[in-house]
C-alpha cells in the first residue's frame, strides 16, 4: 500500500510537473507572440503620415480662409459690423452647429441601421464639401465682376457665408476623421508622435504647399498695372483670382477621387484592421511579466507543499 501510494504520488507529481511545464511554455509563446505582433510592428509613423496625406487636398482648400477668401472679401461691402476678417467666425459657427447635428443625429442614426462610413469616404465627403466651398467662391468672384461691370458697385460680404459654412462641414468629416484614425491606428507608445505627425499633415504641409502654389500663380493676383495691390475693387476686377480658385477646385476634386478609389479604401481598412487586431493581442509589459513570475512562484510553492505532505 505504501509503495502504491508513493507511486501514485509520483504519478501525480509527474503529471503536475508536466502541466506546469506546459503552462510555462504557453506563457512563453504568448509573450513571444505579443512581442512580435505588437502594435509597433503593425503601424508605423510613416503609415500615419500616408493616412493623413489623404486629407491634404481638403486642407489646401481649408487654408484659403486665411488667404484668398480674405483677399476676395476685402473688396466686398461690409454688412454692418461684419467684414472679411469677421467672416472666419462663420466657419466656427458651422462646425458647432453641423457638428452637433452630425454627431448627435446623423451618426447615431447610421449606427442604429448598422451603417458604417469607411474612413476614406469621410475624407471624400469632407473634400467634396471643400470643393463645394471653392465652387461658391468661384460663383462669388464672377458675381463681383458682373456687378462691378454693370453698376461699378461691390456685392455684400454675406456672399461668403456659403464658402465658410461649407468648409466648416467639410472640416467635421475630413479633419476629425484624420485625427481619429491617426490616434487609433498608432501604437500605444507613439500616439503622441502620431498625433503630431497628423497635425503637420493637416496644418503644416498644406500651408507650405499653398505658399509654393501662390508663388507659381502670382501673376493671377496682379492688377492691370502689374502690381499685387488688389485690395480695391477696381484693381481686383482687373486681376484673375478666379483662375486660382479653379485650380483649387481641381485639387479638391482630386482629393475626392483619390479617397473613393477602391485600392485606397481597402488599404486604409486593412491598416485599421491590423491596428484593431494588435490591440486585442496581449502586450509584453513589465506588469504582465511581474504577474507571470508571481503565478509561477505560487505554483512552485503549492507544488512543494504537496510533496511535503
State the predicted function of each range:
Residues 1-284, 288, 295, 309:
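Hydrophobic transmembrane alpha-helices of multi-pass solute transporters/permeases
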Residues 9, 301-305:
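Long, low-complexity Q/N-rich tracts
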Amino acid at each position: 500500500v505504501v509503495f502504491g501510494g508513493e507511486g501514485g504520488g509520483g504519478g501525480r507529481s509527474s503529471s503536475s510537473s508536466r502541466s506546469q511545464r506546459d503552462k510555462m511554455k504557453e506563457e512563453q509563446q504568448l509573450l513571444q507572440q505579443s512581442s512580435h505582433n505588437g502594435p509597433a510592428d503593425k503601424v508605423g509613423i510613416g503609415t500615419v503620415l500616408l493616412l493623413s496625406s489623404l486629407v491634404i487636398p481638403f486642407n489646401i482648400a481649408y487654408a484659403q480662409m486665411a488667404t484668398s477668401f480674405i483677399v476676395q472679401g476685402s473688396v466686398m461691402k461690409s454688412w454692418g459690423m461684419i467684414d472679411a476678417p469677421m467672416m472666419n467666425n462663420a466657419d466656427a459657427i458651422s462646425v458647432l452647429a453641423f457638428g452637433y447635428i452630425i454627431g448627435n443625429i446623423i451618426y447615431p442614426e447610421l449606427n442604429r441601421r448598422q451603417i458604417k462610413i469607411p474612413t476614406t469616404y469621410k475624407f471624400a465627403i469632407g473634400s467634396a464639401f471643400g470643393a463645394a466651398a471653392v465652387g461658391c467662391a468661384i460663383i462669388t468672384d464672377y458675381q463681383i465682376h458682373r456687378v462691378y461691370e454693370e453698376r461699378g458697385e461691390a456685392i455684400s460680404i454675406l456672399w461668403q457665408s456659403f464658402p465658410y459654412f461649407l468648409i466648416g462641414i467639410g472640416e467635421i468629416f475630413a479633419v476629425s476623421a484624420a485625427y481619429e484614425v491617426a490616434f487609433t491606428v498608432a501604437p500605444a507608445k507613439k500616439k503622441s508622435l502620431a498625433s503630431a505627425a497628423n497635425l503637420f499633415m493637416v496644418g503644416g504641409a498644406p500651408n507650405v504647399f499653398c505658399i509654393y502654389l501662390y508663388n507659381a500663380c502670382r501673376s493671377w493676383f496682379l492688377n492691370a498695372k502689374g502690381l499685387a495691390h488688389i485690395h480695391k475693387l477696381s484693381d481686383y476686377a482687373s486681376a484673375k483670382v478666379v483662375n486660382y480658385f479653379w485650380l483649387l477646385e481641381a485639387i479638391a476634386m482630386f482629393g475626392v477621387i483619390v479617397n473613393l478609389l477602391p485600392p485606397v479604401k481597402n488599404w486604409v481598412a486593412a491598416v485599421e484592421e491590423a491596428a484593431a487586431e494588435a490591440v486585442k493581442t496581449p502586450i509584453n509589459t513589465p506588469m504582465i511579466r511581474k504577474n507571470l513570475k508571481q503565478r509561477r512562484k505560487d505554483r512552485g510553492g503549492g507544488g512543494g507543499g504537496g510533496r511535503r505532505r
